UniProtKB/Swiss-Prot annotation:
One cellular-component annotation, GO: ribonucleoprotein complex
Coiled coil regions in record: none
Gene this protein is translated from: rpmE2
Family (UniProt): Belongs to the bacterial ribosomal protein bL31 family. Type B subfamily.
Subunit: Part of the 50S ribosomal subunit.
Name of the protein this chain belongs to: Large ribosomal subunit protein bL31B
Length: 81
């Protein structure tokens, strides 16, 4: 790999703004804000709006809607049902 052309990849802490859930991961994103992690080291803190802790798909709070079929829509529209 060529030197000097790749972004700096380092550990950062992501925090869910809605739930406060935090996790440590690697990223090229930087931040002036830092936080002390469980291992005693300080890492840049990145605040995000949605993580797996608050997204409805991962939390099981997602609502599934049954879509009507084309024939059912036609019958409903013209009162044939």
């Amino acid at each position: 790999m060529k030197k000097g052309i790749h972004p700096d990849y380092h550990p950062v802490v992501f925090q869910d703004s809605a739930t406060g859930f935090k996790f440590l991961s690697g990223s090229t994103v930087g931040s002036a804000e830092t936080i002390k992690w469980e291992d005693g080291n300080e890492y840049p803190l990145i605040r995000v709006e949605i993580t797996s802790d608050s997204h409805p798909f991962y939390t099981g709070r997602q609502k599934f809607q049954q879509a009507d079929g084309t024939v059912a829509k036609f019958n409903k529209k013209y009162g044939l049902a």
